[in-house]
């Protein structure tokens, strides 16, 4: 299921980033009393009562030719376009301004639900000034204090009241849901078209659960797939060309709905920092991953070229050490058949379950080969392990003291579990828990 999206919008220096950090529970946005500090959209997730949602902090929109204002406004308008609900923030201390009214005009045109938050209401005496903002036309203003955390409960109650009921997944559980991500110009749309032209049977174009996303269903060699949000990959236009301006949020939503994510990189240009950042979105969400090296036809080769490039990928994407690597040319439609076995295996392993008895045999054997660590005379005791979830496979290891389970030993156990059961293509999570 895709989570509802909440965008925080307003002019500069009204406290958007402070409220964002309050909602997500950690300091993700930079907070300074300088207009324009948050130029790009910042993404995170939040929860309130029984509702999970994604939230975006945007840069401040203002009148005039301030530095980066064109970029900031474009970013904010994209966030508004993608949001289910908008928190429109104003500042009680400065009162209603022309910039507030300009932001209001943008929000009227969006026709989205808007919750008006009046920030910096730090005491009861200031509440009377809140009513000046009724003139903006968004109903009752919610007085809040970002610095003190006051009023956030009422504000979030109003926000989640606009969330609709969760939509049912329209696809069979055996259907593999694929998303294709990568920085601009690595050939994502070309890969989509190449895949759809490779011995495929297009069943239909159906509306996805994300607003205005188009998912494409197809079959290959007896397996059903759905390519998530093919419209998003093909969308063009001066604002939408840039990953930083449009497709980051769209990619996050597509990843969220996927089983398997194809991370596309450009063989001709090599790996850059942005590739790792984009791939990190899939890893953080615990999705199965296949790394696709596209434009392989453009590389001069000898017998060692592929191995050298694979070594470089492994070095740069160490956090994706479980992912298999496919070398393809979408333009020439070559080597595409190598993709599907990797996709299928990654999907199967993402859903794999291991019997507790077999798992504990492996864990016991691992401990006998490499005894558990000690700290200040205390040894880590591992009592037993069990698998508690799939997608991704998640294991709980019951121990005498969680603090004694160092990262290095947890990694060792993960490697032993992988050696025994495979799990190619998928992350696995190991959680240490104290036995009662």
Swiss-Prot record:
Residues noted as binding GTP 1 in the record, renumbered to the chain: 10-17, 57-61, 119-122
Keyword Ribonucleoprotein set for record: no
Occurrences of domain EngA-type G (ranges): 4-167, 176-351
Keywords: GTP-binding, Nucleotide-binding, Repeat, Ribosome biogenesis
GO BP terms: ribosome biogenesis
PROSITE patterns found in the cross-reference section: G_ENGA (PS51712)
Domain KH-like: 352-436
Annotated GTP 2 binding sites: 182-189, 229-233, 294-297
GO MF annotations, alphabetized: GTP binding; ribosome binding
SUPFAM superfamilies in alphabetical order: P-loop containing nucleoside triphosphate hydrolases
Pfam families per record: KH_dom-like, MMR_HSR1
Coiled coil: none
Matching InterPro entries: G_ENGA (IPR031166), GTP-bd (IPR006073), GTPase_Der (IPR016484), KH_dom-like (IPR032859), KH_dom-like_a/b (IPR015946), P-loop_NTPase (IPR027417), Small_GTP-bd (IPR005225)
UniProt function note: GTPase that plays an essential role in the late steps of ribosome biogenesis.
Family as reported in the entry's similarity comment: Belongs to the TRAFAC class TrmE-Era-EngA-EngB-Septin-like GTPase superfamily. EngA (Der) GTPase family.
Quaternary structure and interacting proteins, as annotated: Associates with the 50S ribosomal subunit.
Designated name of the protein: GTPase Der
């Amino acid at each position: 299921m895709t989570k509802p999206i909440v965008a925080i919008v307003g002019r500069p220096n009204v406290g958007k980033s402070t409220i964002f950090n309050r909602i997500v529970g950690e300091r993700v946005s930079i907070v300074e009393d300088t207009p324009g500090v948050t130029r790009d959209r910042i993404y995170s997730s939040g929860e309130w009562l029984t509702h999970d949602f994604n939230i975006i902090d945007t840069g401040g929109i203002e009148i005039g030719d301030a530095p980066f204002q064109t970029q900031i406004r474009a970013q904010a308008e994209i966030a508004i376009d993608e949001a289910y609900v908008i928190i429109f923030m104003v500042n009680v201390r400065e009162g209603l301004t022309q910039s507030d009214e300009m932001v209001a005009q943008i929000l009227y045109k969006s026709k989205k639900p808007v919750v008006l938050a009046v920030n910096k209401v730090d005491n009861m005496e200031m509440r009377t000034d809140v009513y000046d903002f009724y003139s903006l036309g968004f109903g009752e203003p919610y007085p809040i204090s970002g610095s003190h955390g006051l009023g956030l409960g009422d504000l979030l109650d109003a926000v989640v009241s606009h969330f609709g009921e969760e939509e049912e997944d329209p696809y069979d559980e055996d259907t593999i849901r694929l998303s294709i991500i990568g920085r601009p110009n690595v050939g994502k749309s070309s890969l989509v078209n190449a895949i759809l032209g490779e011995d495929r049977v297009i069943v239909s174009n159906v509306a996805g659960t994300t607003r205005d996303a188009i998912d494409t269903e197809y079959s290959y060699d007896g397996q059903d797939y759905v390519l998530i949000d093919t419209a998003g990959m093909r969308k063009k236009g001066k604002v939408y060309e840039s990953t930083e301006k449009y497709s980051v949020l769209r990619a996050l939503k597509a990843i969220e709905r996927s089983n398997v994510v194809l991370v596309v990189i450009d063989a001709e240009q090599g790996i850059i920092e942005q590739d790792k950042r984009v791939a990190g979105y899939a890893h953080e969400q615990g999705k199965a991953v296949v790394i696709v090296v596209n434009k392989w036809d453009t590389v001069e080769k000898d017998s060692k070229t592929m191995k050298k490039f694979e070594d470089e990928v492994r070095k740069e994407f160490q956090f994706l050490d479980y992912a298999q690597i496919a070398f393809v040319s979408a333009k020439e439609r070559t080597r595409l058949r190598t993709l599907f076995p990797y996709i299928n295996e990654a999907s199967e392993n993402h859903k794999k379950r291991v019997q507790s008895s077999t798992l504990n045999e492996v864990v016991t054997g691992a401990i006998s080969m490499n005894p558990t660590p000690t700290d200040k005379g205390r040894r880590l005791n591992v009592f037993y392990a069990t698998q508690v979830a799939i997608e991704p496979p998640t294991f709980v290891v019951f121990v005498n003291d969680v603090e004694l389970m160092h990262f290095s030993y947890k990694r060792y156990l993960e490697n032993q579990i992988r050696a025994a059961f495979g799990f190619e293509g998928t992350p696995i999570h190991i959680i240490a828990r104290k036995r009662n």
